[in-house]
């Protein structure tokens, strides 16, 4: 064996090296290696180690990005992490039996908490840069979507999360698990030729034992151990690789590597535990470090103080005096008020003082959120509901307590009945209702959060009902009108199916609770009689009409609209009242449509739909196309006026009802005035839809709701009622529109009936010039209508002079009079009108070129342009053109008459001679 492999020592002399070179001249030359090259070990790592190392490095990167809130890089690192995990899935399935590593679950949990924390910080989110804000939304969506596959693992992790020390050691978990599994086989896997390797685990195990035994040593000794760690490793390497050949041989197994990793990880773990125990012994328990100076909670009263009403009131005034001041801890203020309430109840100071403290707690909760436009936190909202209901129950249970804002503070009475307290529960419940609306607007309407917040409406309505009972007992008319309006606004848009069942006789009317229509009628009539302000009365009328329309009380709703004259002065109302008016008109149109009043439905909806922005008029959202027309401040104000999602009216339903109503009115009118050049449009929007469809060279099958209505209109123009009905009433239209109606089957039957009748009218208008007489039974069979109904339709058309015909009852035929012009005659008349207009235009152009336009009597003397006739300046140009033509004709007639007179005189002279 060569001495190169036999001896790995560096202490050989130069002479010995020369001897070796001289004796082995023809053999391979020896090489000297630097210390760096000798320290590099060739290691064959398993696939699992590679994958896990990649995952842990990415997790470290994500943690670093989270510390500095670098959200774009966090997003890119998260994408890298998901890709790395996908690559590691085969290894996890094989080695871990498909169980996700705990360090990976910990990373996902930390990332989710980080995103939620940043997302809930509204002030911090506003200060984020555009790139960070955009990346935050993308990261939130991706993480929420990704962690759905790990919900069970995350739930188990959150039940028993790791401690901080475990989190730091978590990166070594994969290696620990490998080492534990490989530890049992480490002794068997080492051959006889590597005896030093077999002895190494024993030496490694002795080091932790010694470290545990020396737990009472000082921190200096611990630091000394950590400093000499590298020296120990180098000495172990020297002892291990006594033979240079062993150092450079490629290892045939991975168990040696696992042994090394196991030794190092255990050594680090033991030293870390020793250091942690030493710190625990010195410092005791862990304490949370609070930023800034720790403010001690002020003491309520002195230890030996006698707690009575004046002392509690003085303390209450002291706490509330800090209200609205700078650097006031509003959370601490609320806590102090709750503590003061508990003290007052413990010392039995009476219900009046408890009510006073309750009211101040409500005020403090309202003050916690300084920005009025933003909603309050959910914890404060729940607290507010609880305190408000508790206060109202105390007021109702004690009739001798009177709370009113007109009571002066010096006249408050807490000792003898009747008790007078300064405060306004009406203002508190109004603010509570406004906060509830803001909470609903802030939530995503398609999320579970919105449903959870909407459930709170039950408690809000209960609170309003408690306030209603209180003011019915001791309130004035103005206060009762205000609280009644709040109750109405929570009731008017809700549909009560029992009302329709009672109307049809399906439910007994007596012996049951009053229906919502009866409650609305009672509340609104009180406001009509007692209200002094126009706004409350106007809003009550609008809500009353809306509620009647919801329950198909068409005539009551219509009469209220006509008698109140709201349409005359609604433009002077505030924006929220105008929004309520638009909502009322939309719902009134739907009610008219359900009650077969097609023309009234069209009249109610035309003002909303002709503008092209019903979404904005109903306060159901802002159109992005009109964003440039409003400033940021205007947009913010308009968003505050938006209606909560559960109060929205379906816009597609609204548009479909409007277009169908327009079709049933417009198509027969077009057929009746086909050759009338001056016919007016009933519905401009529908007419535009129809014309745009006719301009298309190739029209496919209808897909959207508008296309279905346009296709139905084309079929109706030909009198084909079956095709028209199939386009309007089909599976797709039922799902989109008609199933949204209560009793949708009745609405569909009504639609088919109207389509048959209007198709019959259109057919008679279109083909009346073809027939000399038409059989009424054949028309009834063609349109599947009863014979009396067909007779009635034709009679109305004849009476209204829409159809020039007469009825022959014995033969049951309609005899056409042919008084209207034929198609050729109508086209000829149109042609004559157009030619006449063309002649007028040509004459005007000719007059301008010839100069006759400036004759005297039209635009003044041409030679005296500065002295033109002021009476004709800017007059009717068509009249001037006619005057010019008449003047020329008169001049010509006068000239001819003079010539005739001259000729007659000449003839007489000749005869006399």
From Swiss-Prot:
PANTHER family cross-referenced by the UniProt entry: EUKARYOTIC TRANSLATION INITATION FACTOR 3, SUBUNIT 8 EIF3S8 -RELATED, EUKARYOTIC TRANSLATION INITIATION FACTOR 3 SUBUNIT C-RELATED
GO biological process, one term: formation of cytoplasmic translation initiation complex
Pfam families: eIF-3c_N (PF05470), PCI (PF01399)
Protein name: Eukaryotic translation initiation factor 3 subunit C
Biased composition (Basic and acidic residues): 172-184, 244-263
Entry keywords, A to Z: Cytoplasm, Initiation factor, Phosphoprotein, Protein biosynthesis
ATP-binding found in the keyword field: no
UniProt biased composition (Basic residues): 264-276, 887-898
Matches recorded under Gene3D superfamilies: 1.25.40.570
Sample GO molecular function, one term: translation initiation factor binding
Span of domain PCI: 645-821
Cell compartments where the protein resides: Cytoplasm
Record-listed Phosphoserine modification sites: 34, 165, 177, 186
Cellular component terms (Gene Ontology): eukaryotic 43S preinitiation complex; eukaryotic 48S preinitiation complex; eukaryotic translation initiation factor 3 complex
Region (Disordered): 1-22, 157-285, 856-913
Originating organism: Drosophila mojavensis (Fruit fly)
Subunit structure: Component of the eukaryotic translation initiation factor 3 (eIF-3) complex. The eIF-3 complex interacts with pix.
HAMAP family, A to Z: eIF3c
Family membership: Belongs to the eIF-3 subunit C family.
Recorded superkingdom: Eukaryota
Job of this protein: Component of the eukaryotic translation initiation factor 3 (eIF-3) complex, which is involved in protein synthesis of a specialized repertoire of mRNAs and, together with other initiation factors, stimulates binding of mRNA and methionyl-tRNAi to the 40S ribosome. The eIF-3 complex specifically targets and initiates translation of a subset of mRNAs involved in cell proliferation.
UniProt biased composition (Acidic residues): 11-20, 162-171, 214-239
């Amino acid at each position: 064996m060569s001495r190169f492999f036999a001896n790995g020592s560096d202490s050989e002399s130069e002479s010995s090296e020369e001897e070796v070179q001289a004796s082995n001249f023809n053999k391979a030359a020896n090489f000297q290696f630097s210390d760096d090259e000798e320290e590099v070990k060739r290691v064959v790592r398993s696939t699992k180690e590679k994958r896990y190392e990649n995952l842990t490095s990415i997790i470290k990167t994500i943690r670093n990005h989270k510390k500095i809130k670098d959200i774009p890089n966090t997003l890119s690192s998260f994408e890298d992490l998901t890709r790395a995990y996908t690559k590691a899935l085969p290894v996890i399935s094989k080695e871990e039996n498909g169980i996700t590593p705990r360090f990976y679950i910990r990373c996902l949990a930390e990332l989710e908490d980080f995103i939620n924390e940043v997302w809930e910080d509204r002030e911090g989110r506003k200060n984020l840069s555009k790139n960070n804000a955009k990346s935050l939304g993308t990261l939130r969506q991706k993480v929420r979507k990704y962690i759905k596959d790990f919900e069970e693992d995350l739930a188990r992790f959150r039940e028993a999360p790791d401690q901080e020390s475990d989190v730091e050691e978590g990166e070594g978990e994969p290696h620990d698990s490998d080492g534990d599994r490989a530890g049992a086989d480490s002794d068997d896997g080492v051959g006889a030729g590597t005896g030093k390797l077999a002895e190494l685990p024993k030496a490694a195990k002795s080091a932790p034992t010694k470290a545990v035994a020396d737990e009472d040593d000082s921190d200096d000794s611990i630091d000394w151990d950590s400093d000499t760690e590298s020296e120990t490793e180098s000495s172990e390497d020297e002892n291990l690789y006594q033979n240079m050949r062993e150092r450079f041989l490629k290892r045939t197994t991975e168990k040696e590597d696992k042994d090394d990793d196991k030794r190092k990880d255990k050594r680090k773990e033991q030293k870390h535990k020793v250091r942690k125990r030493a710190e625990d012994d010195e410092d005791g328990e862990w304490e949370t470090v609070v930023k800034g100076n720790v403010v001690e909670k002020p003491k309520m009263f002195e230890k030996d103080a006698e707690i009575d009403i004046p002392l509690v009131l003085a303390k209450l005034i002291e706490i509330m005096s800090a209200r609205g001041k700078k650097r006031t801890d509003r959370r601490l203020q609320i806590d102090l008020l709750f503590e003061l309430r508990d003290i007052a109840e413990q010392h039995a100071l009476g219900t009046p003082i408890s009510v006073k403290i309750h009211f101040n707690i409500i005020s403090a909760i309202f003050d916690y959120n300084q920005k009025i436009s933003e909603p309050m936190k959910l914890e404060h909202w729940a607290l507010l509901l609880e305190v408000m209901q508790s206060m109202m129950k105390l007021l109702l249970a004690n009739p001798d307590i009177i709370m009113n804002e007109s009571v002066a503070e010096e006249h408050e009475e807490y000792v003898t009945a009747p008790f007078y307290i300064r405060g306004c529960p009406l203002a508190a419940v109004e603010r509570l209702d406004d906060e509830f609306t803001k909470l609903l607007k802030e939530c995503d309407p398609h999320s579970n959060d919105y449903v959870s917040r909407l459930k709170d409406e039950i408690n809000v309505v209960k609170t309003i009902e408690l306030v209603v009972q209180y003011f019915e007992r001791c309130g004035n008319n103005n206060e009762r009108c205000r609280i009644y309006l709040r109750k109405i606004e929570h009731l008017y848009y809700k549909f009560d199916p029992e009302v329709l069942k009672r109307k049809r006789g399906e439910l007994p009317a007596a012996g049951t609770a009053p229906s919502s229509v009866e409650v609305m009628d009672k509340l609104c009539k009180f406001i009509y009689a007692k209200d002094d302000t126009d706004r409350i009365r106007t809003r009550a009328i609008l809500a009353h009409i809306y509620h009647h329309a919801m329950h198909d009380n068409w005539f009551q709703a219509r009469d209220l609209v006509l008698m109140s004259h709201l349409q005359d002065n609604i433009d002077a109302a505030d924006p929220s009242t105008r929004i309520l008016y638009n909502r009322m008109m939309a719902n009134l149109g739907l009610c008219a449509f359900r009650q077969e009043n097609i023309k009234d439905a069209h009249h109610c909806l035309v003002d909303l739909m002709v503008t092209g922005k019903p979404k904005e008029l109903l306060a159901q959202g802002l159109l992005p196309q009109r964003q440039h027309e409003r400033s940021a401040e205007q947009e913010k104000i308009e968003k505050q006026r938006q209606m909560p999602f559960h109060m929205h009216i379906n816009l597609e339903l609204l548009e479909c009802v409007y277009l169908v109503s327009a079709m049933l009115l417009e198509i027969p009118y077009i057929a009746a005035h086909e050759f009338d050049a001056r016919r007016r449009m009933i519905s401009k929007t529908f007419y535009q839809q129809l014309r745009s469809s006719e301009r298309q060279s190739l029209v496919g099958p209808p897909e959207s709701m508008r296309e279905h209505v346009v296709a139905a209109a084309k079929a109706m123009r030909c009198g084909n009622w079956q095709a028209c009905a199939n386009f309007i009433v089909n599976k797709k239209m039922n799902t989109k529109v008609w199933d949204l109606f209560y009793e949708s089957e009745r609405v569909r039957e009504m639609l088919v009936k109207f389509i048959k009748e209007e198709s019959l009218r259109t057919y008679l208008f279109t083909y009346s010039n073809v027939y000399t007489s038409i059989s009424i039974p054949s028309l009834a069979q063609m349109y599947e209508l009863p014979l009396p109904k067909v007779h009635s339709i034709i009679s109305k058309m004849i009476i209204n002079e829409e159809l020039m015909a007469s009825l022959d009852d014995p033969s049951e035929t309609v005899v056409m009079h042919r008084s209207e012009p034929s198609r050729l005659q109508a086209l000829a008349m149109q042609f004559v009108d157009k030619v006449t207009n063309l002649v007028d235009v040509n004459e005007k152009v000719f007059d301008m070129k010839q100069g006759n336009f400036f004759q005297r009597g039209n635009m003044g003397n041409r030679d005296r342009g500065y002295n033109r006739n002021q009476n004709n300046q800017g007059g009717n140009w068509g009249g001037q053109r006619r005057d010019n033509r008449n003047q020329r004709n008169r001049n010509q007639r006068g000239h001819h008459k003079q010539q005739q007179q001259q000729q007659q005189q000449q003839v007489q002279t000749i005869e006399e001679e």
